[in-house]
Amino acid sequence: MLRVIIVDDEQPAREDLRERLNEEHGIEIVAECSNALEAIPAIQRLQPDVVFLDIQMPRINGLELASMLNPESMPHIVFVTAYDEYAIRAFEEHAFDYLLKPLDHQRLAKTLTRLSRDLIVKNNLHKVIKPILRHIPCSGHNRIFLLKIEEVEYLSSELSGVHVVGTVQSGYTQLSLKTLEEKTPFIRCHRQYMVNTEQLGEIQLMDNGAAEVITRSGKHIPVSRRYLKSLKEKLGIA
C-alpha cells in the first residue's frame, strides 16, 4: 500500500489529484495539506511513502519545504507544478519525479508504477534486515518505561502521539505507527490502529463491510474496509 500526502494551496488541484489517485489500486491518501506549515508536521507524524508537492505556495514554497526535510528519512517527493523552470532545482532537492499541470494520465501512471516498484524493493529489503523490537519505550504519569511486545494489546495514533495499550499498563511512545509496523509483528487494521495478533480474541464483521477486532481482554478496535482483507490474509482466514 502506497501511503500518500497531497500538498497544494489550490483546492481544485488537490481534488483533481485525489480523484486520479483514488482511481488507482494500492494507494492510500493519508492527508491533504494546503500549505507547508500544515505539511511539515503531517509528514513527520504520518511518515508517508510519497508526497505530491506543489511548488508555488504562499510563505514557504514546495522547494523550501523539501529542503527542510531530513534527506535520510524523507519520503519520495513528486513535485506537481504548472511551471517547468523549477525542474533542475527540484531534482537538487532530491525529487523522485516532476509532473506538470494539467496532469497527464499516462505520465502519472508511470510515476506511480515507479513508486510502487521502489516500495516493493524497500519492503523486501526490510524483511531481510529489519530489526525487531522487544520493548516499546513509553512515557506516562511523569515516568519513562518499557512495555514488552507480548504485553501490548494494540496501538492507536492520537494527537499526543501513539498510544500503546498494554494488558497491565499503557503509555505513549514517540515512535510512529509506520516505524512500529516495520519493527514489530503487529498488524495494521486501520489508518490509526495496529493490533497484536497474540492478544486477538475475535473479529466481528459488520454489514457496512468494516469490522472490529476484540482483544482477549474485551477491548474493541476498529478495522477499516481498506485493511480488512489484508488482516484476514495475514491471519490465514482470507
Curated annotation (Swiss-Prot):
Top-rank taxon of the source lineage equals: Bacteria
What PROSITE patterns is this protein classified in?
Answer: HTH_LYTTR, RESPONSE_REGULATORY
Matches recorded under SMART domains? LytTR, REC
Ranges of residues in domain HTH LytTR-type: 136-237
**Molecular function terms, GO-annotated:** phosphorelay response regulator activity; transcription cis-regulatory region binding
Establish whether keyword Phosphoprotein is in the entry.
yes
Q: Which GO terms describe its biological process?
A: regulation of DNA-templated transcription
What are the Response regulatory domain coordinates in residue numbering? 3-116
Q: Which keywords are on file for this protein? A: DNA-binding, Phosphoprotein, Transcription, Transcription regulation, Two-component regulatory system
Sites of the modification 4-aspartylphosphate? 54
Cellular component, GO annotation: cytosol; protein-DNA complex
Database matches in InterPro entries: CheY-like_superfamily, LytR-like, LytTR_DNA-bd_dom, Sig_transdc_resp-reg_receiver
Q: What is the protein's given name?
A: Uncharacterized response regulatory protein YPO3287/y0902/YP_0397
